[in-house]
Swiss-Prot record:
Gene3D superfamilies documented for this protein: Hypothetical protein af1432, K Homology domain, type 1
Record has Membrane as a keyword: yes
Alphabetized UniProt keyword annotations: Cell membrane, Endonuclease, Hydrolase, Membrane, Nuclease, RNA-binding, Transmembrane, Transmembrane helix
Residue ranges constituting the KH domain according to the UniProt record: 209-272
EC number: 3.1.-.-
Reported function: Endoribonuclease that initiates mRNA decay.
Protein name: Ribonuclease Y
Family the entry assigns: Belongs to the RNase Y family.
The organism of origin for this protein: Oleidesulfovibrio alaskensis (strain ATCC BAA-1058 / DSM 17464 / G20) (Desulfovibrio alaskensis)
Localisation per UniProt entry: Cell membrane
Membrane topology annotation: Single-pass membrane protein
Keyword RNA-binding part of the UniProt annotation: yes
Amino acid sequence: MGLIEIVLLLVGMAVGAATGFILHKIVSAKRLQDARELADRIIEEARKEAQAHKKEVLIQGQDELFNQKRELEREFKEREHELKIRERRLQEQTERLEEKLEKLAQKEHDALSVEKELNRRERTLGLKEEELTQKIAEQDKKLQEISGLTSEEAKARIFSEVEARTRHEAGKMIRVIETEAKETASRSAQKILATAVQRYAGDFVNEQTVTAVSLPSEDMKGRIIGREGRNIRALEAATGVDLIIDDTPETVILSAYSPLRRQIAKMALERLISDGRIHPARIEDIVRKCEQELEVQLREVGEQATFDVGVHGIHPEIIKLLGQLKYRTSFSQNVLQHSMEVASLCGIMAAELGMDEKRAKRAGLLHDIGKAVDHDVEGPHAVIGADLAKKYGESKDIIHAIAAHHEDVPPKSALAVLVQAADSLSGARPGARKELLENYVKRLEDLEGIANGMEGVSKAYAIQAGREIRVLVNSDEVDDDTTYMLCKDISEKIEKNLTYPGQIRVTVIRERRAVGVAK
């Protein structure tokens, strides 16, 4: 390449560089101008938007200010109205207070006037009382001089006459009241009791716990006794029951205080006889199984009893105790059957009286629950039963009805009285209960002794198996009106001192005979 070409190349490069620079300058200036114009437009638009937003904010602020002003005006008017109402009420109260003050002032004035009048009358009465006391003293002195009696003697004589007259009038009043009450109560009670007895269809058969076990042959007695008596001793030790083997053919008698033990012994002995294997180890095993089976049976019996009566929600332990009542008797009456009968009678009578039938049945079913454990726990069975009912969550009215059905505590509710009536009705019906001859004779003697111990009684006779006592009185000592008082006193004393099933009728007879002789 020659020098000229190099020079031309350099010149061309310089011209190109200058041209490029100029073009770059022109383009940069153009871009800067466009950027300035864009910035001006953006600034203008931002200014316009700011002005528009400012106007909008101002308008919104004015609206809020207007709303707040209107709200404040409304609140002001409401408060002003409320203040006016309060002011009016305050004015009315002030007027009423002023009126009351005027009345109080008037009453105070009247009270002062009355007090002055009372003071004047009191002074007058004091003077008259002194005068009257003086006159009474003078009259007493004159009466003592005339009658020859002191004031104390005269007072005692007057009190005696007033007492006799009062007792006479009280007897007449009691006779009228009792007659009316008996007429009304007797009709209602007879209707309710008759309805209950007619609607209840229970068994009227006395049940007794069986204590005799039949044997297939006389040889079985020897096997039960065992070598040197070891089998019978093992059976008695395991069950707590005495086995009596005597000359009675093919029979073993079981004797024990606890009916449950007697039942376990009966079940075990029957199973041993049926099995044929009788030795001490086998006896202990069978007795243990019989105890478990009886436990299950007791619950089943209790559940069946609650189902038959229609009572639900009873604690499982109470159900078990109900089952134990199957093996408990009272005057030869089965206690479980008696409790179910009382529950049914309570339900029927409660329905007739408009009471809660279910609660009445519940109280009737549980009223003798204490008899299930009364041989293990000291105290009256009614109190024991109430404690058990309380322990297992029964309500207060049920607990009270149980505790009061023999009046160990006074009955304070209609339910308690209803259970008493049903209990008496179940126990007093013919054939329901029996008692020992010695107890029967002693009860009759005690009954006659109470009547004979009353003043004015000449003779007393217990009749109808002790369910009625007839009392003959001396007509010279007891009049017709006093007869009613005497009858009531005898009834109360019998209720207080004797224990008896059902009711005892007290009849007082006053007879006056006039005998003349024609000559």
